């Protein structure tokens, strides 16, 4: 396995969303948001459970009405992952979901009413130990900031965020995280850089409205990758016009690529050329689908020939190097066996699952020894 990247993370305070720590060196969490009608309890619960299965640490649910708040109560009872309620304009909805056990409130203090209503929500959050996320978005900047700056700028997003932060500071509430999202990569990145210098609270990263599954993943990888490589960010959401499950997968892929947080298999595969001795592309695509259930961190290299194959295999948990009719299988950098090219997928799946079980057992024993 490769060593972890030497990224020096920004120091921040810590909050808890349910039992999930955010900030102060805690693992960077990956979250998504449901896109069902919240009042359709069954559909929303099913989607949340699908997100749980692929590793979502936190799930956000839009709660636009009191009917949705009542549905939220039923949803919360049926899932295990911490839930964030996304609320705008009506402070009473925030108070209601707080009664029902919400794990975090996503609000902007400035758009839920006058100072007294803000105080009521914040006091409720304090009493019930519920953190708040301030969510600034370039597409919904306050009118006076639009007039002042002419268009969304990093300074405009920062000023908007600091207004909301000041609201909470005046009420002596510090259990919050902040996001300053934009669909433009450079706008979002610079906004987060400015904000990171101004506050100590955890930062929720995202490129909002990034696009479809492919283009949105690319934008998010660039924007979030830049920030994460600079040590900025404590939790993230990849926003895609796609199945929310894909947001979680891409989020973990970004963290794996930067070696910040490992979950599941990190496939290393060549783009193929005429030297390939077996169907690399078909093998990788099939294994990615078949092995989605494995959460054990592993590097698996699948290289079609001997040009780069042995070198990649040396630093992989398992590695395959293409050969004539049979390909070399490496384990922890040591050549162990040869696999039939015609039955590569099934053989390699079996070896990967066996290795994952071996690693899991070794970790279990290590934990038991530490506990003793």
UniProtKB/Swiss-Prot annotation:
InterPro entries cross-referenced by the UniProt entry: Dihydropteroate_synth-like_sf (IPR011005), IspG_bac (IPR016425), IspG_bac-typ (IPR004588), NO2/SO3_Rdtase_4Fe4S_sf (IPR045854)
**Pfam families listed in its UniProt record:** GcpE (PF04551)
Q: Which domain of life is it from?
A: Bacteria
Q: Which cofactor does it need?
A: [4Fe-4S] cluster
Query: Which keywords does UniProt give here?
Result: 4Fe-4S, Iron, Iron-sulfur, Isoprene biosynthesis, Metal-binding, Oxidoreductase
UniProt-annotated binding residues for [4Fe-4S] cluster? 270, 273, 305, 312
Q: Does the keyword Oxidoreductase apply?
A: yes
Return the similarity comment. Belongs to the IspG family.
Return the PANTHER family for the record: 4-HYDROXY-3-METHYLBUT-2-EN-1-YL DIPHOSPHATE SYNTHASE (PTHR30454), 4-HYDROXY-3-METHYLBUT-2-EN-1-YL DIPHOSPHATE SYNTHASE (FERREDOXIN), CHLOROPLASTIC (PTHR30454:SF0)
Which NCBIfam families does this one have?
ispG_gcpE, PRK00366.1
The entry's protein name is 4-hydroxy-3-methylbut-2-en-1-yl diphosphate synthase (flavodoxin)
Originating organism: Salmonella schwarzengrund (strain CVM19633)
Q: What taxonomic lineage is listed for the species of origin?
A: Bacteria, Pseudomonadati, Pseudomonadota, Gammaproteobacteria, Enterobacterales
């Amino acid at each position: 396995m490769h060593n972890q990247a030497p990224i020096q993370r920004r120091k921040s305070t810590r909050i808890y969303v349910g039992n999930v720590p955010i900030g102060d060196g805690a693992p960077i969490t990956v979250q998504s948001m449901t896109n069902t009608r919240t009042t359709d309890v069954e559909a929303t619960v099913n989607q949340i459970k699908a997100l749980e299965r692929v590793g979502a640490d936190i799930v956000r649910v839009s709660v636009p009405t009191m009917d949705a708040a009542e549905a939220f109560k039923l949803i919360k009872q049926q899932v295990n992952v911490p839930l964030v309620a996304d609320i705008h304009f009506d402070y009473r909805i925030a108070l209601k979901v707080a009664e029902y056990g919400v794990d975090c409130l996503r609000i902007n203090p400035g758009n839920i009413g006058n100072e007294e209503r803000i105080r009521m929500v914040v006091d409720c959050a304090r009493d019930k130990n519920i953190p708040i996320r301030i969510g600034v978005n370039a597409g919904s900047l306050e009118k006076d900031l639009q007039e002042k700056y002419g268009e969304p700028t990093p300074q405009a997003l920062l000023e908007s965020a600091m207004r909301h932060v000041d609201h909470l500071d005046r009420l002596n509430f510090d259990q919050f995280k902040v996001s300053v999202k934009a669909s433009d990569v450079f706008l979002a990145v610079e906004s987060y850089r400015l904000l990171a210098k101004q506050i100590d609270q955890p930062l929720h990263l995202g490129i909002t409205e990034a696009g479809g599954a492919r283009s949105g993943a690319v934008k998010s990888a660039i924007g979030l990758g830049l920030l994460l490589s600079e040590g900025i960010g404590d939790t993230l959401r990849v926003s895609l016009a796609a199945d929310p499950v894909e947001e979680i997968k891409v989020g973990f892929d970004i963290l794996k690529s930067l070696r910040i947080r490992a979950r599941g298999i990190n496939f290393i595969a060549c783009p193929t050329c005429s030297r390939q001795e077996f169907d690399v592309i078909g093998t990788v695509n099939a294994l990615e689908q078949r092995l989605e259930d494995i959460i054990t961190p592993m590097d698996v290299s699948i290289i079609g020939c001997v040009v780069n194959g042995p070198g990649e295999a040396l630093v992989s948990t398992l590695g395959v190097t293409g050969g004539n009719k049979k390909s070399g299988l490496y384990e922890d950098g040591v050549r162990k066996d040869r696999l039939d090219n015609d039955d590569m997928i099934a053989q390699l799946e079996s070896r990967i699952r066996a290795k994952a079980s071996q690693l899991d057992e070794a970790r279990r024993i290590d934990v038991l020894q530490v506990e003793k």
